[in-house]
Amino acid sequence: MRRDFRIFALAGIGLTAACATVPAPGDPAVPVYAVAETQPVVTANEDAADDPAIWRNAAAPADSLIVATDKKAGLYVYDLGGQPQSFTAHAALNNVDLVDMEDQGIVVFASDRSDLAQARIALFRLDTASGSLVELGSVASGPGEAYGICG
């Protein structure tokens, strides 16, 4: 009886040890610190600054631009130092993304949440020379709330 208990106890310890998690292989975590920060958006204290998309200038990386939302007021374009280059007023935009369409330029997409029943995607072209946005219009994206974009 005592021998059976020992076998059962050893088996239990072995099974418990097999359940231990093993850290995932990979490089250790490295802290990343900001070297620049944007000023608070127009609608301060409203949890409105959100969702940046970065256009990387391959020819001159320091001239890359960031497009980000002020969910209550519109879209900002920032330089990499966090300085605003332009602002496009347009209430209720969120979930911004951009795509390099080569000859057609950089197209910026943002979910237009001004009509929660009929979702739309607002479209802009990013003028990379001036750091401004040119509104192209919007397209319907189906019934319901426009909350994100799948590329």
Language-model regions, residue ranges each:
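Sequence/structural signature of beta-propeller domains
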Residues: 20-151
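Bacterial N-terminal signal peptides that target proteins for export
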Residues: 1-9
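C-terminal motif of bacterial Sec signal peptides marking the signal peptidase cleavage site
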Residues: 16-18
